[in-house]
């Protein structure tokens, strides 16, 4: 006869799953964002050249749309946590991936226009680099330490 498991409230199961999920996603996204942020800050010229090449290619815009939409949707489906703590960062990043992916897939000409406008201002690479790096540090901290 199989042993019966003790009763565990559903809210506790969901919360444990979400915390484990959050930690994994923070460990995954945090270091990537740190590297991206540092790269944008120490070599903005390389990022600018990459962005200019990207904006000249509809195929790359399309692929980038898919590469933003798929993981963004995966995050939204598995981590749609609207609690005001560090986990909200992951949820917002998921939704930004979905929105950004859809925008790239449906409106590639607007992506080119907006991207070209942003590249015309050098500070538009340094400021996002600092933000991305800071988000990476926060996520890495909570993913590995906190």
Give residue spans per PLM region.
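Membrane-interface extramembranous regions
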Residues: 5, 9-146
């Amino acid at each position: 006869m199989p042993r019966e498991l003790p009763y565990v409230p559903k809210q506790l199961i969901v919360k444990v799953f979400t915390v484990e999920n959050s930690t994994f996603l923070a460990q995954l996204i945090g270091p990537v964002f740190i590297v991206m942020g540092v790269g944008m800050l120490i070599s903005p010229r390389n990022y600018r050249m990459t962005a200019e090449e990207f904006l000249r290619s509809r195929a790359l815009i399309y692929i980038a749309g898919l590469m933003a939409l798929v993981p963004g949707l995966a995050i939204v489906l598995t981590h749609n946590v609207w609690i005001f703590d560090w986990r909200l960062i992951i949820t917002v990043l998921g939704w930004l991936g979905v929105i950004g992916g859809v925008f790239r897939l449906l409106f590639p000409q607007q992506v080119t226009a907006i991207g070209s406008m942003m590249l015309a201002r050098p500070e538009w690479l340094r400021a996002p680099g600092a933000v991305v790096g800071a988000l990476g540090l926060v996520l890495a901290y909570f993913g590995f330490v906190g």
